[in-house]
């Protein structure tokens, strides 16, 4: 932050030193002209004048010939007022740029037709980025200079002035030399920034130099000293021509007409952008407003549009993976933080990394200067607070339900046939707990029948004041018959509330719903498991889905149709697309031992969470053939742990039944288990043995329908939801825009912390610095005043746009009068005042914005690429509009619009020469030794920055010498 604040201050110091040197070099002229009368002003155009003219708004400060002390006082007042007006213009320009960001971020929905006939919908930006940069963005950045030129001409009876044109040229020089010098220097040593859209830079740079060359041509070559109507209009019409050329260069419509262009979703803004490639054989058509768009029908999105859906999906996936990576890194770096804090950190980091417009950097710079804080951090914190608030509101609503709800604790209950009774729990939640609530219950047959499988039960449950839970019991009838699992239902009905208002103490039915009602579930299903069979073992379902963040997943193995005896069921995991060994899950195998009457066991498998945005991997969990275990086998297994024994047994009708355990006197190191098969299949069975076999076959444990469970590992829902929320919040128009006047007034009176060096800790609350407080109190008047400007939510930003530009025009009129009166008070010509002071005041926000863009952006386009385009727009709009109006006015009156070519033509020529040097140096820096227009080795940075600062000082020096006739101009 220290560097951010000192470097622009250093450039301001250069300005002031230049002015001081200029004043001292002309002290003899100023002293000689101290006694000059007003009428002598025309006798010497080469000297400054103490005779002030009436401004567009401000009157003359009488008397015209004050004492030396009064001059110092007046100059101080004018200077302070001018600086304060510059602060006001910066703040209203902030609102203006916010509206432009919202306007240029407008989207339109389109329908994408895939080759297979499927259609999906997506959005595209309406405004082309290059067009918006050269039109609305440039207008927002240069509105004070443009309006100053127009207001000066219109406010002085359509006569040419020096303040407006000189401000435009001076601002162009400051932008081209000082701002670029600063951007070159602030990039960290060893890092570089290159211009990404070089062809657009070439076009705008060429038009920028041409604009000032054109000024010289119409002032000194075509019609010296006179601006004709066609010259003014042509100057203005060069503006749309420049925009079209830049757009053509950006879209390659001339030289790249036959190069196939594909469109994909941009990672940063969620928009569809274009790149080149080979034309595929299949096309994807796009519909907008019901019309199919292709290269033969329409010229949508600046050219032939064939959208590669698969590639767009890949880019979306890449963006989501990047979001997921950021969240994982933050979670590892800050394990102690809650999810809301991690969302805030991730949101801020995502917003910081994405590509931003010139408007955003201008807004960010202004708010940092005026104590309004870092808008990215404020936005991230607001989003996190909103998420917490919504959670708290939902929780509070659920807990404060005014109606008592009566329902079963769970919708399903299970019991064994020999359990005697089954207990069902009824819950009372919400409402007034001081009331007494009555609810009826009644059993109903399902596959189980009352009287043979369970006891029919009905009654009324009474919840006394303060009671929230009651229990009812239903009798279960046991038998010795093998049968399938059966179920019956228990219903709740007829909720009543006790009240003293009625004679019987019970509310009428039509009054009950306001105090109590049935909740969900109001019906419970009771399943009776048969206990006369060893059981059928199965999973609940063939497929299950689990989140990768589950940690330990538990899978139930059910024992149905009986629960008699102890049974061992082996299980194991099998790899599918998911890999074991700790990559996607940990390999698991073992045995489940079901005790007598035990009907469910769980298998635990550890799932590895690698926090992928999208995941769909499978593995399998399989159970093996169950086997019945008698007590003798359990003893054998226990002795096995002690060591040394031999098991002898026999197969009974195909099933291993263990009978005896013979322990050795002296245990041996290795356990040896010998199972002797005593049953011979060839031996005929007696009738008794046949009956025993039939009964054993009927009662043995078997596998059920689902013996192999497919486990599908999916991404974490919470993790994916968080990433999706971050994806949706990357539109910067939501960050800089406002939704209500209330929001604007709160923001206006709130002082926030500015930039800091520890960006990673943005989740921690930062206190405003002394600088933040000072700047806030200096600018709070402007903040509150401009809070009356309509929010950017209205009319899609156009209401804010119109009101803001009117406010800028009013303040610019004041600035023009103050600058002119300040100059005449100290004896400076308007051309010098404009080049130095006014150009400085209007360029300080751009200086901060370019510095931030140079350090944060991956490319140099946002920091210096727009400087050249802005310079061209200043001439074509600022001078073109003003001179066109004046030329038409004078032509209508049969007069000529006269403009003195001297100072302006000289400044324009000087600037053009230096601009060629500037552009040449920037292009040379793209060589591999340096690597880019900005940054590079420290020595190269210093030399480049010093050269550009020297060019600006020479421009100021020679322009001032020519203005005071020390050197001859044109």
Swiss-Prot record:
Glycans are attached at residues 41, 157. Residues 1-32 form the signal peptide. The chain crosses the membrane at residues 72-92, 134-154, 168-188, 202-222, 229-249, 798-818, 822-842, 872-892, 904-924, 942-962. This is Sodium/calcium exchanger 1. The keyword Phosphoprotein applies. Residues 93-133, 189-201, 250-797, 843-871, 925-941 are cytoplasmic. GO terms for cellular component: nucleoplasm; plasma membrane; postsynapse; sarcolemma. It is found in: Cell membrane; Cell membrane, Sarcolemma. Activated by micromolar levels of Ca(2+). In the absence of regulatory Ca(2+), channels open rapidly, and then inactivate rapidly. Inactivation is enhanced by Na(+) and is inhibited by micromolar levels of Ca(2+). Ca(2+) 1 binds at residues 417, 453, 479, 483. The lineage of its organism: Eukaryota, Metazoa, Chordata, Craniata, Vertebrata. Ca(2+) 4 binds at residues 453, 479, 483, 486. One of its GO terms (molecular function) is calcium:monoatomic cation antiporter activity involved in regulation of postsynaptic cytosolic calcium ion concentration. NCBIfam families: caca. Its main location: membrane. Ca(2+) 3 binds at residues 417, 479, 481, 483, 530, 532. The cytoplasmic Calx-beta domains bind the regulatory Ca(2+). The first Calx-beta domain can bind up to four Ca(2+) ions. The second domain can bind another two Ca(2+) ions that are essential for calcium-regulated ion exchange. Belongs to the Ca(2+):cation antiporter (CaCA) (TC 2.A.19) family. SLC8 subfamily. It comes from Canis lupus familiaris (Dog). Gene3D superfamilies: 2.60.40.2030, NCX, central ion-binding region.
């Amino acid at each position: 932050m220290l560097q951010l604040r000192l470097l622009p201050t250093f450039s301001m110091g250069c300005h002031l030193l230049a002015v001081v040197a200029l004043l001292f070099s002309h002290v003899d002229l100023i002293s000689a002209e101290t006694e000059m009368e007003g009428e002598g002003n025309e006798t010497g155009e080469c000297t400054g004048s103490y005779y002030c003219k009436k401004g567009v708004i401000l009157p003359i400060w009488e008397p015209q010939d004050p004492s030396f002390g009064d001059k110092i006082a007046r100059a101080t007042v004018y200077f302070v007022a001018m600086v304060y007006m510059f602060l006001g213009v910066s703040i209203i320009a902030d609102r203006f740029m916010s509206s432009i960001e919202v306007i240029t971020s407008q989207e339109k929905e389109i329908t994408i037709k895939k080759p297979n006939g499927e259609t999906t919908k997506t959005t595209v930006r309406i405004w082309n980025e290059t067009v918006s940069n050269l039109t609305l963005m440039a207008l927002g950045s240069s509105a004070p200079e443009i309006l100053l030129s127009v207001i000066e001409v219109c406010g002085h009876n359509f006569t040419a002035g020096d303040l407006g044109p000189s401000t435009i040229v001076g601002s162009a020089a400051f932008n081209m030399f000082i701002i670029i010098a600063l951007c070159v220097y602030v990039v960290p040593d060893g890092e570089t920034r290159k211009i990404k859209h070089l062809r657009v830079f070439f076009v705008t740079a060429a038009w920028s130099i041409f604009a000032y060359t054109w000024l010289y041509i119409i002032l000194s070559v075509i019609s010296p000293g006179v601006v004709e109507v066609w010259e003014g209009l042509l100057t203005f019409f060069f503006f749309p021509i420049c925009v079209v050329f830049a757009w053509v260069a950006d879209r390659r419509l001339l030289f790249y007409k036959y190069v196939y262009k594909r469109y994909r979703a941009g990672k940063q803004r969620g928009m569809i952008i274009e790149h080149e490639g080979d034309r595929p054989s299949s096309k994807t058509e796009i519909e907008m407003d019901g019309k199919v768009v292709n290269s033969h029908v329409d010229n949508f999105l600046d050219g032939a549009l064939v959208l590669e859906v698969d590639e767009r999906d890949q880019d979306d996936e890449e963006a989501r993976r990047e979001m997921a990576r950021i969240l994982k890194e933050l979670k590892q770096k800050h394990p102690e933080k809650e999810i809301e804090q991690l969302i805030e950190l991730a949101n801020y980091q995502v917003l910081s990394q994405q590509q931003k417009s010139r408007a955003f950097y201008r807004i960010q710079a202004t708010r940092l200067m005026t104590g309004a804080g870092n808008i990215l951090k404020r936005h991230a914190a607001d989003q996190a607070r909103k998420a917490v608030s919504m959670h708290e509101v939902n929780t509070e609503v659920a807990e404060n339900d005014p109606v008592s709800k009566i329902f079963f604790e769970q919708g399903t209950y299970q019991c064994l046939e020999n359990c005697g009774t089954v207990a069902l729990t009824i819950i009372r939640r919400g409402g007034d707990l001081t009331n007494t609530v009555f609810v009826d219950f009644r059993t109903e047959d399902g596959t189980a029948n009352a009287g043979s499988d369970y006891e029919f039960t009905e009654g009324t449950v009474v919840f006394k004041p303060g009671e929230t839970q009651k229990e009812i019991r239903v009798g279960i009838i046991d038998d010795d018959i093998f049968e399938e699992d059966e179920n019956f239902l228990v219903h709740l009905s007829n909720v009543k509330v006790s009240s003293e208002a009625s004679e019987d103490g019970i509310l009428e039915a039509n009054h009950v719903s306001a105090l109590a009602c049935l909740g969900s579930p109001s019906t419970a299903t009771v399943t009776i498991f048969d206990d006369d069979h060893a059981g059928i073992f199965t999973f609940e379902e063939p497929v299950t889905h689990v989140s990768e963040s589950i940690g330990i997943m538990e899978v139930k193995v059910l024992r149905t149709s009986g629960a008699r005896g102890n049974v061992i069921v082996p299980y194991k995991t099998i790899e599918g697309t998911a890999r074991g060994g700790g990559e996607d899950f940990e390999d698991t195998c073992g045995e489940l031992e079901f005790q007598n009457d035990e009907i469910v066991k769980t298998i635990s498998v550890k799932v590895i969470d690698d926090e992928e945005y999208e995941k769909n991997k499978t593995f399998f969990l399989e159970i093996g053939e169950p086997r019945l275990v008698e007590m003798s086998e359990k003893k054998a297994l226990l002795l096995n742990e002690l060591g040394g024994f031999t098991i002898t047994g026999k197969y009974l009708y195909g099933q291993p039944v263990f009978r005896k355990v013979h322990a050795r006197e002296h245990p041996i190191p290795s356990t040896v288990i010998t199972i002797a098969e005593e049953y011979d299949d060839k031996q005929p069975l007696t009738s008794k043995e046949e009956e025993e076999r039939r009964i054993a076959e009927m009662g043995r444990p078997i596998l059920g329908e689902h013996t192999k469970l497919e486990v599908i590992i999916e991404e974490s829902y919470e993790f994916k939801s968080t990433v999706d929320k971050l994806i949706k919040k990357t539109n910067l128009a939501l960050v800089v825009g406002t939704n209500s006047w209330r929001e604007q007034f709160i923001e206006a009176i709130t002082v926030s912390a500015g930039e800091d060096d520890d960006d990673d800790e943005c989740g921690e609350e930062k206190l405003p610095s002394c600088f933040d407080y000072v700047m806030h109190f200096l600018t709070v008047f402007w903040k509150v005043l401009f809070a009356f400007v309509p929010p950017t939510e209205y009319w899609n930003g156009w209401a804010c746009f119109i009101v803001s530009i009117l406010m800028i025009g009013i303040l610019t009129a004041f600035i023009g009068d103050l600058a002119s009166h300040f100059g005449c008070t100290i004896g400076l010509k308007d051309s010098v005042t404009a080049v130095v002071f006014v150009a400085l005041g209007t360029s300080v926000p751009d200086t901060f914005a370019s510095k931030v863009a140079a350090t944060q952006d991956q490319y140099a386009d946002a920091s210096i690429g727009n400087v050249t385009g802005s310079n061209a727009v200043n001439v074509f709009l600022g001078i073109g509009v003003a001179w066109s109006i004046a030329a038409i006015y004078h032509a209508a009156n049969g007069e000529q619009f006269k403009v003195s070519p001297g100072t302006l033509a000289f400044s324009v020529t000087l600037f053009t020469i230096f601009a060629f040097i500037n552009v040449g140096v920037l292009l040379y820096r793209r060589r591999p030794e340096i690597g880019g227009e900005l940054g590079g080795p420290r020595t190269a940075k210093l030399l480049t920055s010093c050269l550009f600062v020297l060019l600006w000082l020479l421009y100021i020096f020679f322009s001032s010498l020519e203005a005071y006739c020390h050197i001859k101009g044109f």
